């Protein structure tokens, strides 16, 4: 069931919620996160939302967690957050990165991730999910059946929305920045990824997601008299610090993606 959050708990009135910074897919990249936070602070927003996939990665899981707890953003759970706290001994045996993450995090961040909501109705206008309303693994906007990202048809997107009618839908998961109108009443925004600009995956079939530059990505959405305005940002950061930690943990594929915005072969 979709969780509804009261605007009073976020220290603003609902009619003041007009300018929202949207983050997703930080993936333990503290250095990218810090650059994005500094950029947001220079622009000014009413609230920051974090769409999940927060701590999975070979960079700085615990330090990223501690920084986010200081920042106290509105946050939902992503599929790889769930996979961390559900990880079994067999998962760790076949995935050394998962074992590193669990060792680095300790128990407190696992408890925090477990209490994060699957999705969130921020107010009557704005709905948050990590991937799609019914499944944290299914890309809402992107069709990867050909091995790379293409825009889904409006019919497919409507089916995946499962009746969710909020005027603004904020989603992540694909790491691919998108701004998509559905009919005349809905706008879907994917801010892209803060922490990882390319990857390969084998579900639901083998595919790559690539942004072709290393910049950390996020978005700001603003409600104006004419409707929602969207600004997508690409932020430079100290990539080499993240690369060094990925290489230290044996993840040359991550190092290549961090530097290039392309998936390794």
Task: Label each residue range with its predicted role.
Residues 2-73:
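N-terminal active-site segment of His-dependent metallophosphoesterases
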Residues 40-44, 122, 162-165, 220:
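Glycine-rich phosphate-binding loop signature in dinucleotide/nucleotide-binding domains
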Residues 27-31, 56-59, 80-85, 121, ...:
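Active-site environment of divalent metal-dependent phosphoester hydrolases
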Residues 64, 70-128, 134-165:
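Active-site neighborhood of divalent metal-dependent phosphoester bond hydrolases
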Residues 23-24, 48-53, 57, 74-79, ...:
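Active-site neighborhood of phospho(di)ester-bond hydrolases with catalytic His/Asp-centered motifs
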Residues 154-182, 186-189:
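Anionic-ligand binding region
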Residues 181-265:
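Acidic, His/Gly-rich catalytic cores of divalent-metal-dependent hydrolytic chemistry
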Residues 12-21, 121-127, 183-186, 227-228:
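Beta-strand-turn-beta hairpins that frame and shape the catalytic cleft
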């Amino acid at each position: 069931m979709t969780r509804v959050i009261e605007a009073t708990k976020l220290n603003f009135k609902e009619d003041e919620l007009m300018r929202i910074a949207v983050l997703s897919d930080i993936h333990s990249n503290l250095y990218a996160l810090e650059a994005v936070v500094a950029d947001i602070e220079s622009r000014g927003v009413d609230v920051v939302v974090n769409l999940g996939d927060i701590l999975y990665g070979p960079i700085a899981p615990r330090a990223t967690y501690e920084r986010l707890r200081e920042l106290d953003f509105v946050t939902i759970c992503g599929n790889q957050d769930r996979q961390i706290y559900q990880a079994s001994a067999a998962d760790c045996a076949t995935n050394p990165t998962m074992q590193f993450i669990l060792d680095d995090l300790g128990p407190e961040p696992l408890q925090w991730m477990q209490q994060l909501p699957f999705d969130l109705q921020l107010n009557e206008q704005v709905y948050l999910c990590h991937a799609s309303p019914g499944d944290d693994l299914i890309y809402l906007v992107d069709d990867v059946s050909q091995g790379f990202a293409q825009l889904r048809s409006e019919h497919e997107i409507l089916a995946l929305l499962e009746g969710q009618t909020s005027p603004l839908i904020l989603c992540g998961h694909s790491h691919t920045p998108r701004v998509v109108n559905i009919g005349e009443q809905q706008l879907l925004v994917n801010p892209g990824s803060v922490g990882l600009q390319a990857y390969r995956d084998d579900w639901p079939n083998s595919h790559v997601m690539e942004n072709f530059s290393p910049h950390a990505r996020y978005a700001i959405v603003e409600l104006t008299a004419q409707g929602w305005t969207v600004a997508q940002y690409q932020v430079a950061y100290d990539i080499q610090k993240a690369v060094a930690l990925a290489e230290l943990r044996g993840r040359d594929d991550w190092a290549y993606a961090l530097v290039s915005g392309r998936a390794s072969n």
